[in-house]
């Protein structure tokens, strides 16, 4: 399983939606349940966030590669989680 990093902001509505989709998909698809997402709140950890190339949140990195940046739909979140378990 590939490592996943999520850069987010606590008050970001798009970030909350992405997390909700992630939880829903884990309930709907048992193969996603073991996936762990390292969550990095960029305002609390600017030193880490500054090491990555992105502008908008939420931003997902899978295995060190940026795979999604900005708002996300549920079907996009499912595709992202599938990349993790490939």
For the regions a language model picked out, list residue spans one by one:
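Local sequence-structure signature of Cys/Sec-based thiol-disulfide redox active-site neighborhoods
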Residues: 1-28
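Thiol-based oxidoreductase modules, predominantly thioredoxin-like and allied folds used
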Residues: 32-46
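A general structural signal for short secondary-structure boundary/capping elements
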Residues: 10, 52-53, 82-86
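Generic recognition of short, well-ordered alpha-helical segments
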Residues: 16-20, 51-52, 72
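Non-catalytic, surface beta->alpha helical segment in thiol-disulfide oxidoreductase systems
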Residues: 61-86
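Structural micro-motif
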Residues: 51-61
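Non-catalytic interaction surface on structured domains
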Residues: 19-22, 29-31, 65, 76-78
